[in-house]
Amino acid sequence: VIVCGILGLFTLKDSRSGVHEKNGNYWKDLIYGFKPSVVKENSKLYLAFIAICLFQTAVQVFFPYLLIYLQHSLGFNIEDLLGYVTKPVLIAAPFVIIALVAVIVLVGKLIDKIGKNILLFVAIALFTVGLFAASFMHTAGKFALSAIPLFAGYGLLGIMLNSTVRDYTPEDKTGLFQGIRMIFFVLIPMIVGPSIGDRVCKAYAGGTYVGDDGLSNYEPCAQMFLAAAIVALLVLIPCIILRKKGINKNTDIKE
């Protein structure tokens, strides 16, 4: 992280051509993003908000329970994994990280070249297929295979949706949308997602485990990935509407 920060200090340049936000009334600015007229004027931005809200909700259906699922439902032991951390693995680790960074850069260039129309739906497909596959994998080895499309789709879809939100946010009103952004990015997903996951795990749990607090809890079950996949499919709805409006265009942004 430190190395990436140092590299970014010298390689990333802020745009100096942006429009400065004007000082306004605090209370008016606070409710700005909730105004129906603002929602209508920036319809693509709010469609992107809905898409990322559904995406993050799908993630929160399974993510809070993932480590517990691996440990108690699949019998995965973190100590066993540490046994594979040998000297050659440590030597190879930096090269793997460099390769991942290169892949991210290439994905960014690919998005710029062919646009979001195709890659967005590819990302949704990868993420959803990975979730469906994970719901049928009942050993750690098989789960690892399903994790490849799952987390590849997760990373790509996150990049795509975040860049879409950025593209549709008016430059001179960026701060005015940060509050409403956090509602869609964090508040709703972190309430709804874990609630769905908890209900599914209680309904289909194969047993219980004793947590660090000494209390008995339901074991997370594979069905939570299926529930997450169903939520992930809903991301298609705002994305299809965005595509019809022209996902690579931001003509409805009002400044």
Each predicted region: which residue ranges?
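Loop-to-transmembrane helix entry/capping segments in MFS-fold secondary transporters
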Residues: E171-F184
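Intracellular juxtamembrane helix-capping segments at the cytosolic ends
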Residues: L156-P170
